[in-house]
């Protein structure tokens, strides 16, 4: 008899479904790509539901705290405190290992689905628009694997033969794969980005928007990768290409103090999301945790301060020292919080 089980359920879409739809609707890659970018700033993208789980910037805050260059002024709220106390890598009782893993593999799954719909990650699709979203998927997948291999494996320069993380290049199979070596992960990262860069030639984002990856952003990501691999020549070459394109301008010492880095319209910003009340909540955001003038955690005792030794190592002639300098009417310096950086 007939089965009551749906062969193609309507409550989610598979890579196979995307492949079929893409044959007659070229906009499917665009829709999937734009939806994937929203994961980079979505609350609970790491699956914990906490106020320190909101995509890429939550990873950035946690890893800055783990570096020791930034500290939390006082504890009590709980958010980011395991990172601030440097205990998140010594116990499984905190969510960070799960959160970061889940966040990046969620992005990898989404980018793989785009690549599957385009015919696979070894075949460049036809059509300029499809090539753009194919290239963006490759660049975002590379960015995700780059962060994963840095978080969960040995440094490339220290032991590139060490086992690192599982590498998935398609969602057309659910079969689990074994860990790849650090070197193999980096090989895929470099390939994805070098495949993406020429396909993004001439791509212009909608006016005022910087959420999508363009060619300069892809080059910037690859420059970071080369730096981590110790390939300083190629890192410098790519960085110079971005500067020479004049698509983005280097900020002067006045702009870095007065701008507050608060707007995506700042010419120096290459890749950014404009957070608004319509696309993000108030408390669990980058601003809520980092901006002293936002009525949230940073305002109410959870300030993030620069480490004293790092602050003291900044020459007085360096304008960036003013980010962390504020004095009261008696000439006494307040705590080293980021008064004028955001």
Regions flagged by a language model, labelled:
Residues 130, 182, 210-211:
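Short coil/turn linker motifs that delimit alpha-helical repeat modules in TPR/alpha-solenoid proteins
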Residues 11-17, 56-59, 154-161, 202-284:
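Short, surface-exposed recognition loops and adjoining beta-strand edges that mediate ligand/DNA contacts
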